[in-house]
């Protein structure tokens, strides 16, 4: 087998930027930032969502108000809701 074709697999700390939760895991992702975790220094990878903040794992649903195509059309052309007038 050829040598030095695979990236280095090493322990890194992932930081959930939403909740501040940190966890140690193995990864090949490189980072210039480091952090002290449990007495050791590890590379730091920032993530927007993890098991600590994902709705599937937390049981909290995050609802966003997304207008449908019809609502956007009516808003764009200034049409009122026909059902609201009745």
From Swiss-Prot:
<dbReference type="GO" id="GO:1990904">
    <property type="term" value="C:ribonucleoprotein complex"/>
</dbReference>
<dbReference type="GO" id="GO:0006412">
    <property type="term" value="P:translation"/>
</dbReference>
<comment type="subunit">
    <text>Part of the 50S ribosomal subunit.</text>
</comment>
<dbReference type="GO" id="GO:0003735">
    <property type="term" value="F:structural constituent of ribosome"/>
</dbReference>
<keyword id="KW-0689">Ribosomal protein</keyword>
<keyword id="KW-0687">Ribonucleoprotein</keyword>
<dbReference type="GO" id="GO:0005840">
    <property type="term" value="C:ribosome"/>
</dbReference>
<dbReference type="InterPro" id="IPR002150">
    <property type="entry name" value="Ribosomal_bL31"/>
</dbReference>
<dbReference type="InterPro" id="IPR027493">
    <property type="entry name" value="Ribosomal_bL31_B"/>
</dbReference>
<comment type="similarity">
    <text>Belongs to the bacterial ribosomal protein bL31 family. Type B subfamily.</text>
</comment>
<protein>
    <recommendedName>
        <fullName>Large ribosomal subunit protein bL31B</fullName>
    </recommendedName>
</protein>
<dbReference type="InterPro" id="IPR042105">
    <property type="entry name" value="Ribosomal_bL31_sf"/>
</dbReference>
<dbReference type="Pfam" id="PF01197">
    <property type="entry name" value="Ribosomal_L31"/>
</dbReference>
<dbReference type="InterPro" id="IPR034704">
    <property type="entry name" value="Ribosomal_bL28/bL31-like_sf"/>
</dbReference>
């Amino acid at each position: 087998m050829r040598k030095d074709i695979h990236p280095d697999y090493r322990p890194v700390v992932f930081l959930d930027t939403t909740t501040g939760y940190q966890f140690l895991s193995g990864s090949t992702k490189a980072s210039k930032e480091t952090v002290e975790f449990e007495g050791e220094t590890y590379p730091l990878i920032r993530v927007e969502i993890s098991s600590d903040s994902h709705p599937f794992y937390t049981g909290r649903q995050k609802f966003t108000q997304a207008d449908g195509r019809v609502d956007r059309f009516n808003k764009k052309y200034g049409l009122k809701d026909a059902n609201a007038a009745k």
